[in-house]
Amino acid sequence: MCDLDLVREADPEDLKLGYVVLVGTVLSSSKSRWNQFTETVPEILAGEEVALVNAVQWSQTARKDVLMATNPSARHALDFGKTGERTLSACLGDAASQVPAYQLLSEGMRFEARLAHDACDFDIDYVFEVDDCLEDFGIEELAFDLEPAAYIEEFRKQQFARSNRSMLPLPAALGAIRLTSVEDEVLERHVHAYLASRKELL
């Protein structure tokens, strides 16, 4: 059961974490589903019934497919962005309590999508589509200033806290999020670029 009136009547800020989760979930589905989803963002934001029902159905179907995947690597697809989320939260320390949960998760997804471009050839156009979709939902980039060395150390710490392997669930294509090894050089390069871009927002 899903009471759509609760969605329509909710404070827009309260819905943003759900929007971010939708983006990550549909990204794990398929190219055609992703295209359908991104095209209906305005209708979802407007609270149109068909768009909301479709979004919920697409999300539930995608989540079911991940959980029932025969490939063990694919079962981690719903964790896309969460290592970056936990890393940013830990590095921000007490300041993280002032940052909405949806922004922490969206930043994790933005960063890991860029890692995926180098680590598993995720098309750069799709990286930008993830950015655009989050922006369309009103979720802007977060401004902060962190030291790259501390971020890298925490990122690896968060990885190994849940696995003995240095692998991340990253999209190789729309609908194909798999565990992928990320070399130190790739991580370092992207961390430096990512943190520099966020510092410029201050």
Describe the role of every protein-language-model region.
Residues 48-149:
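Active-site segments that bind and position negatively charged phosphate/pyrophosphate groups
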Residues 10-16, 98-101, 161:
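Structural motif
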Residues 2-80:
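Carboxylate- and glycine-rich phosphate/diphosphate-binding segment that chelates Mg2+/Mn2+
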Residues 4, 9, 20, 47, ...:
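Surface-exposed loop/turn and secondary-structure junction residues enriched for glycine/proline
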Residues 25-35, 92-97, 115-125, 163, ...:
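Short helix-capping/linker segments at secondary-structure and domain boundaries
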Residues 39, 124-202:
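C-terminal charged capping/lid subdomain of soluble metabolic enzymes
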